[in-house]
Amino acid sequence: MADLQKIVDDLSSLTVLEAAELAKLLEEKWGVSAAAAVAVAGPAGGGAAAAPAEEKTEFTVVLASAGEKKIEVIKEVRAITGLGLKEAKDLVEGAPKPVKEGVNKDEAEKIKVQLEKAGAKVELK
């Protein structure tokens, strides 16, 4: 176990250039390449990238469908977006469409609740 700790200490004291040279020497000795290791680590890195995505700061509120109460949903869309009657009606009838983009989480949740109360199905992306 003391040998492993010595190896860890020695590796920790290497400069970046020395570590790169060590990597090349080990690649040659073991007959492997760092590119293969990166390809294998790629999916694991993708999983790690998904975690920060959960902490998004900007959301898009998407109207999935208007539901049964289309007129109520149109009224809410107008109130939320400031669109005219025709534009709001076109947006609601063309669902799924984004209602508001680039909003923070609190505002997105508030908009979602408003639209769902009116009878719409809403997604946050």
UniProtKB/Swiss-Prot annotation:
Cellular component aspect of the GO annotation: cytosolic large ribosomal subunit
Keywords per UniProt: Ribonucleoprotein, Ribosomal protein
Gene3D superfamilies: 3.30.1390.10, Single helix bin
Keyword Ribonucleoprotein recorded: yes
Signal peptide: none
Pfam family, one: Ribosomal_L12
Lineage top rank: taxon: Bacteria
Protein's UniProt keywords contain Repressor: no
One Gene Ontology molecular-function label: mRNA binding
GO BP terms: translation
Record-linked InterPro entries: Ribosomal_bL12 (IPR000206), Ribosomal_bL12_C (IPR013823), Ribosomal_bL12_C/ClpS-like (IPR014719), Ribosomal_bL12_oligo (IPR008932), Ribosomal_bL12_oligo_N_sf (IPR036235)
Quaternary structure annotation from Swiss-Prot or TrEMBL: Homodimer. Part of the ribosomal stalk of the 50S ribosomal subunit. Forms a multimeric L10(L12)X complex, where L10 forms an elongated spine to which 2 to 4 L12 dimers bind in a sequential fashion. Binds GTP-bound translation factors.
Function description: Forms part of the ribosomal stalk which helps the ribosome interact with GTP-bound translation factors. Is thus essential for accurate translation.
Family note: Belongs to the bacterial ribosomal protein bL12 family.
NCBIfam families: L12
Identification of the protein by name: Large ribosomal subunit protein bL12
Organism placement in taxonomy: Bacteria, Pseudomonadati, Pseudomonadota, Alphaproteobacteria, Hyphomicrobiales
